[in-house]
Amino acid sequence: MLGILLYCRPGFENDCANELQDKATALEVFGFVKTKRNSGYVFYQCYDPQQVEYLLEKLDYKQLIFARQLIAVKAFINDLPLDDRISPILEITRNLPLGGDLYVETPEGDDTKPLLTFCRKFTVPLRQALRKHNSLTAKENRNKIFYHLCFLDNKSAYIGFSVPHNRSEFYMGIPRLRSPSEAPSRSTLKLDEAIQVFLTAEEQQERLHSGMRAVDLGACPGGWTYQLVRRGLFVTAIDNGAMAQSLMDTGQVTHYTVDGFKYEPERKNIDWLVCDMIEKPKRVAKLMGQWLIDGWCKEAIFNFKLPMKKRYQEASEDIKILTDMFEKEDLQYELQAKQLYHDREEITLHVRLIGNHWGKQLGNG
C-alpha cells in the first residue's frame, strides 16, 4: 500500500491536505502530501506502507470536511501501455480483496475533465476483465470494497479501493442532481444534496417527512424552502425579502419579514431548522447552537461562509464553537460538516441532539 487519496473541490487542495495531515499526525501516521492547485485531489503518502490500512480504518469519511471520497491506494502507475492498459491493472488488483464494484474516475480538476469520456468507455471492458479473473462480484455488492482507478492522464493512474460505510457511494464523490424548473433558485440543490449526504433513505423517511414543521432563516426567495415543501413539511420562512409566490400558493409556507437573528418561534416544537444566511460563520454557529440548546428545534442544516484564506482553520474554529456550547450543557449530539459539490466558498453542517432529551424545552413545546 502507498497512501490515502482524497478527492476535493478544485481550489481547496490545501484545506483538504491540512485536514488530512492533522488527522494522520494525531494518529501518529506520518507521511507527506502530493497535490497541486486546482487538481481536485490530495494524495498522502505514508512513510510506512504498513500503516495505510490502519489510517484508512481510523479515518472517518463522515468527519472529513473537504473530502469527497476516501481511497486507500495500492499502487500508482505512470506508464500504462496505450495498447493494453488492462493487464497491468489486473496484476495489481489480484492481490486485493474481492471487490463489489469498480469506479474508473478522474478528479474534478481543470487538467483532467477531458478524461471523463475515456473513463466511462474504459469502465465496461475493465469491469468484465476483473470479473473474468474473479476479482469482482458478478453483480454490484455495496457491502464489499469498491475498486477505484483514478486517472491523472491517459496513462497515469492511482489504483486503490474504498471500504463500505466509510466512503461516498457516488461516482467521483459527486451526486448527480437536476435543478427543478419550479425551484426559485439554484441554491435549492445545496439542501437537496445535504439531505442525501447526511441522511440515509430510511432516516429521511423517519425524520424528514410530510406533516413535520421547519423554519428557514434567510429563506428568500425560497430555494431551501422548496426542498422542504416538496417533502411535505410546513415551513416558516424568515426573511426581509420576498418569497416566491409559487411557494406561498402551496399553503405550506408562512412568511415573516423579520431578521433571522431576532426571530423567536411561537411554537417550540420545530422539527427542522435550515439556514443559508450570508453572515460571519461564528455568528451563525452561535445562533444555531442556541436554537438547539434552547429546544427550539430537533435538527438543523446550515452553511458556514468561509474566507478566501485559512478556510480549514476557520471551519475548525466555528465547529468548536458549536461543540463547546453543547458540551457545556452536557448535551449529546451528532455533527457532520461537508463541503458539498454544490457548495462554493462554504461548508454545510448537519447537527442533531440525541440521547434521552434534546435541548431545554423537551416536553414543553
UniProtKB/Swiss-Prot annotation:
Q: Its biological function?
A: Catalyzes the 2'-O-methylation at nucleotide C2498 in 23S rRNA.
SUPFAM superfamilies registered for this protein in UniProt: S-adenosyl-L-methionine-dependent methyltransferases
Principal place of residence: cytoplasm
The answer on whether this UniProt entry bears the keyword Amino-acid biosynthesis reads no
Write one Gene Ontology MF term.
S-adenosylmethionine-dependent methyltransferase activity
Starting at the broadest rank, the lineage of the source organism is: Bacteria, Pseudomonadati, Pseudomonadota, Gammaproteobacteria, Alteromonadales
Q: Which family does it belong to?
A: Belongs to the class I-like SAM-binding methyltransferase superfamily. RNA methyltransferase RlmE family. RlmM subfamily.
Q: Which UniProt keywords apply?
A: Cytoplasm, Methyltransferase, rRNA processing, S-adenosyl-L-methionine, Transferase
| Keyword DNA repair part of the UniProt annotation | no
What's its EC? Answer: 2.1.1.186
Q: What is this protein called?
A: Ribosomal RNA large subunit methyltransferase M
Q: What is the native source organism of this protein?
A: Psychromonas ingrahamii (strain DSM 17664 / CCUG 51855 / 37)
As for subcellular location, the record says: Cytoplasm
